[in-house]
Swiss-Prot record:
Protein name stated in the entry: Heat-inducible transcription repressor HrcA
Swiss-Prot/TrEMBL keywords: Repressor, Stress response, Transcription, Transcription regulation
Biological role: Negative regulator of class I heat shock genes (grpE-dnaK-dnaJ and groELS operons). Prevents heat-shock induction of these operons.
Natural source organism: Chlorobium limicola (strain DSM 245 / NBRC 103803 / 6330)
GO molecular function, a single term: DNA binding
Cited Pfam families: HrcA
Amino acid sequence: MDSPELTLRERQVLGIVIQSYVVSAAPVGSRYIARNYNLGLSDATIRNVMADLEREGFISQPHTSAGRVPTDKGYRYYVDLIMHVQRINDEEKRRIDADFGQLTCERKGTSTEVLFSAAKVLGTISRQLSVVLSPAFSNAVFEKLDMVLLSSSRMMVILSIRSLFLRTIVMELDIEVSRQMVDDVVAVLNERLSGLTLVEIRRTLVVRLSDCTCDSALLDRIVRSSGELFDETPMIERLYISGAEYIIDQPEFKQPEKVRDLISMIEDKTSVAKLVDDATAAVEAVKPQGMDVSITIGKENIERKAGELTILSTPYYVGDMVGKLGILGPTRMDYEHAVRVLNYMADCLSTTLSEVP
C-alpha cells in the first residue's frame, strides 16, 4: 500500500481508535484513550498523535463530535499492518460445528442444503450479511446424464457434475419419443462426453456426435439445447444469502435513506453475488497474514452502493471446483473475528461437501 509508515505511537493509537470504535460505534477522544489504556502518554501527547493521524487521513472528525473515527484509509492500514488474526477458539469452533451439523442434518444433507446451511450459520456467527456462491460450472467435469421421460413430448434432464453437484432441466419436446430412444441417446452422450469439462462439451459437441447412428431427431434436440444444458449456471442461481436482519440493525444504517439503499442493494442479488465474486480482483484486496481472505473496504468497492461496506471473501473447494464464501458489513467491523470465522467456515464447507453422499 502507498500509505506512509507510522510510528509505534501512531500504530498504537490508530489500533485503539479502531478497536474502540468497532465496539462502541462512538467517536474516540484522546482523554478516553489516556484514561483507559496504559500507553504511558499524556492526554496532550495522544491528542497530538491523533492530529498527525488525522492530517495523514487515517482518522477523521465527525461534525458534531470532539472524538475521531477511522477512515477507509485507517481501516486499510489496520488490516494490512496492525491486526493479528488468531486461530478460532474452541468455543466458537464448537458452536459453528454444532449449528452447521444440526442444520445440515435437518435439511437432508444435499449439496444445495449444505450451502444454505453454511450461509445461515455464517450470518448468525458473524452478525453480518453472509453470502455463499456455489462453484461455477465452467470448468466442472461432466460425469453422466440421465433423462426421465415425463410424457411422450416432455422429459427431465439430470446432469451429474463430478464433485456432487446436479443440474436438473425440464425440456419440452417438439417430437414424440419412446423410452428406448431416450435410453439410446443417454448411452451415447455418456460414452462420448463423460470426463469432459462443460466448456469442452459446448465447444466440441457437434463434432463428437457427428457419426452417431442413434435416433437423430432426439439427438438434434439435445444439440440445439446444449447452451442451456451445458452452459454456466447464472450467478443469481448460485447465490445463498442470510443475515440481512443483522446488518440492517447496525447503527450505521439507522437513517431511512441509508436503510433504503442497503435494502435495495441486498435485493439486487446479482450485484451482491458480483461483489463477493469480484472482491479478490479488486486492486486493494489483501489476504492478511497468509490467510486466503480478500478484504475490500468502503470506496475500494466498485459498486457505489457498497461505498460504506467492507466485503470479505474467501474460496472453498469441492473437488476441482471453487466456490466463494463472503461477509458483508459496515466498515466498522471486528475484522479479526470476521476473518477467523470466515476461514473456519470455508474449511467446514469444503470438508462437508466432500462427504455429501
